[in-house]
Regions:
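N-terminal acidic, proline/glycine-rich, low-complexity intrinsically disordered segments
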Residues: 1-7
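Short, low-complexity intrinsically disordered segments enriched in A/P/G/S/L with frequent Arg
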Residues: 2, 15-22, 31-36, 41
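Intrinsic-disorder-associated, low-complexity terminal segments enriched in Asp/Asn/His/Tyr and depleted
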Residues: 7, 23-24
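Residue-identity detector for glycine
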Residues: 27-29, 39, 59
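Bacterial N-terminal signal peptides
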Residues: 48-59
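Predominantly soluble domains enriched in secretory-pathway, periplasmic, or organellar proteins
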Residues: 58-424
């Protein structure tokens, strides 16, 4: 068992003076990065059972308090269930599971189309992508790709999807109007993630096995450059102005910054221990890096390529999610079964909320009044009520676990789609 950092979540976190560089000890892939720790203590189990029981009682009458809603308006959360070969559909207005959709084998990553009422599901073991109609909540099409797809990235105009095929070292390009693969582009060794830039001009691909990042020209549908970066590159974030891509490398605890105008690596930053996921502020100013083995998250100044600070948080932080007003960061702590809340402008952790077992994926409802948390081991989605008030420029947050919604076996990713019937 790893030595864990003991801390009190009620106290202000210690700011770490620097992030030590520690050699990576595990041969992890993208999908395996959050499955390192198994088993929980009796105390954790009892605590969770009590929390779940109370939440279930509240959940009997749980429903979001909203003004009168146009009956054509719908809001659904979609959860991929890896071991159930299905996607659960949660009505986020009623806060209940309304349907289970059978998809391919071992569904992992999900993506929302911003321009049409569709969700895309990467089925890792059946080597295909399911297209779900959100109006009918059923599979509208299944498109074969190549071996071991984990993630789907959709262009901002909703016309293309890009899928990195980890087992065949290439990227499939799907025309979403034709619902067909229009190109298969060779990239580096074991590509884990392909992400399209906000301006739709380039797709960045992290090649875990080759320690490189490939850059695909979306007009020519060809690789324009492949750059050596750091060890076992994994997660990617691209700045809102499409000027830079950052890549997290858990193999040597570094972040690489790539200038997309010159296609050059402009910085290698030492970060915390086992950086596996990044969360970007909507304004692009800061990146928050979850350091799984360090029990910390690091703050990176995106435009100056500097690590400004690191904070102790819960055990084994995984996903991060920033509110649209850039004020709060939510972090799921895989090892301590809770979600931490960090006030960005104040630079402090302001609280935590207990959830189910092994929390991972996060999603905020469109008006951000509820946070949904995927609990991978307990097979449910925790719903946290979120409110914010400002008093003398200080942010306080009142959070409460509203309910726990059962889903499938080993859920992992979650996305939310809001739309009106017959329209966008």
């Amino acid at each position: 068992m790893r030595r864990l950092i003991e801390h009190s979540e009620k106290a202000a976190p210690r700011r770490l003076k620097s992030a030590r560089r520690i050699h990576y000890r595990h041969g992890l892939g993208t999908a395996e990065a959050v499955s390192l720790h198994d088993g929980v203590s009796t105390r954790q189990v009892v605590k969770w059972l009590v929390t779940a029981t109370l939440a279930a009682i509240v959940g009997l009458t749980a429903c979001r308090q909203l003004p009168d809603i146009d009956p054509s308006y719908h809001e659904f959360a979609y959860v991929s269930n890896g071991k159930s070969d299905s996607v659960s559909v949660i009505d986020t207005l009623a806060l209940r599971n309304v349907k289970t959709i059978n998809v391919g084998k071992n569904p992992t990553g999900l993506a929302v189309n911003p321009a049409r009422n569709e969700i895309y599901v990467a089925n890792t073991e059946s080597n295909n992508v399911s297209i779900i109609s959100t109006e009918k909540n059923e599979v509208a099409a299944t498109i074969g790709v190549h071996r071991a797809p984990y993630f789907v990235s959709v262009s901002s105009d909703g016309k293309r999807a890009y899928v990195a095929n980890s087992g065949s070292w290439n990227v499939s390009v799907i025309d979403l109007d034709k619902r067909a693969v229009i190109a298969t582009i060779p990239v580096g060794n074991a590509p884990g993630l392909a992400k399209v830039s906000p301006d739709d001009s380039v797709v960045a691909v992290s090649n875990r096995g080759g320690n490189t990042v490939s850059l695909i020209d979306t007009h020519k549908l060809a690789v324009r450059d492949t750059l050596p970066v750091c060890s076992q590159p994994q997660d990617l974030v691209i700045l809102p102005d499409s000027s830079k891509v950052y890549v997290a490398c858990p193999g040597n605890n570094q972040l690489a910054s790539i200038d997309l105008k010159t296609d050059r690596v402009v910085a290698l930053l030492d970060i915390g221990k086992l950086p596996i996921q990044m969360a970007l502020k909507p304004d692009g100013g800061e990146i928050f890096v979850s350091n799984f083995d360090g029990n910390t998250f690091s703050v990176v100044e995106a435009y100056t390529n500097e690590v400004s600070s690191s904070y102790l948080i819960g055990r084994n932080p995984v996903r991060g999610l920033v509110t649209s007003d850039n004020s709060l960061l939510y972090v799921s702590n895989f090892g301590s079964d809770n979600v931490s809340v960090y006030a960005i402008d104040e630079g402090r952790v302001i609280g935590s909320v207990g959830v189910g077992s092994r929390p991972d994926g996060l999603a905020l409802t469109p008006n951000e009044d509820h946070l949904l948390v995927v609990d991978t081991k307990s097979g449910d989605v925790a719903v946290i009520r979120t409110t914010k008030t400002r008093d003398n420029s200080k942010i306080s947050a009142e959070r409460a676990l509203v309910t726990m919604i059962p889903v499938g076996n080993q859920p992992n990713d979650i996305v939310i789609k809001a739309f009106r019937s017959g329209g966008k």
